[in-house]
A protein has these predicted regions:
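Well-ordered beta-sheet/strand-loop patches within structured domains
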Residues: 1-172
Length: 172
């Protein structure tokens, strides 16, 4: 995997699930493949957009449904936010320093509440900093209905989550 870098632990593995659509399958798999094997040195910042690159036909992406300012539309790379959300959650539970993410403009029930993320080339990104003191390795895998992001390195913290009940937000 990343021999010689001192990578010895699975820091975290996170999986999200999605309903089948051909475009979604292609774009999610393409994004995961571009990101797979990324090594982030201590102090470096991982950027989803840098790892995955621009979503173009030449890079293997196809048109699909995406959300743009709260409206569904068809564009290249539709569905890649699934990988962004999975990556954000892996970073969240790894204890790495969270740098940048942007939630969708409305809640999507298949994503973890409060921990979903969208991306758009080149500025809307998912970023985290390797503050572990050791190199980390980003590994991806996928099926027809799920995508998994695992982060390997040297475990340095333990992260726990607690879910509070949903409440209505009232603006004053």
């Amino acid at each position: 995997m990343a021999g010689g870098l001192g990578i010895k632990d699975v820091i975290v593995t996170f999986t999200t699930y999605y309903p089948y659509a051909e475009y979604r399958l292609i774009n999610i798999h393409r994004a995961a493949l571009w990101m797979d094997g990324t090594i982030v040195q201590p102090g470096e910042i991982f950027s989803y957009n840098k790892a995955v690159g621009e979503r173009t036909e030449a890079r293997g992406f196809v048109p699909g449904i995406m959300i743009d300012n709260g409206v569904f539309k068809k564009d290249l790379g539709g569905g890649v936010s699934q990988v962004a959300t999975t990556t954000w959650n892996a970073a969240w539970f790894s204890g790495l320093e969270l740098v940048q993410h942007k939630p969708h403009s409305f809640y999507i029930s298949r994503y973890p509440a409060g921990r979903e993320s969208t991306v758009a080339w080149p500025n809307v990104d998912v970023k985290f900093k390797n503050n572990s003191g050791h190199p980390i390795f980003v590994d991806t895998s996928f099926t027809k209905s799920s995508v998994t992001v695992s982060i390997y390195g040297t475990k340095f913290v333990y992260v726990e989550r607690d879910i509070a009940p949903k409440t209505k937000f009232i603006e004053h």
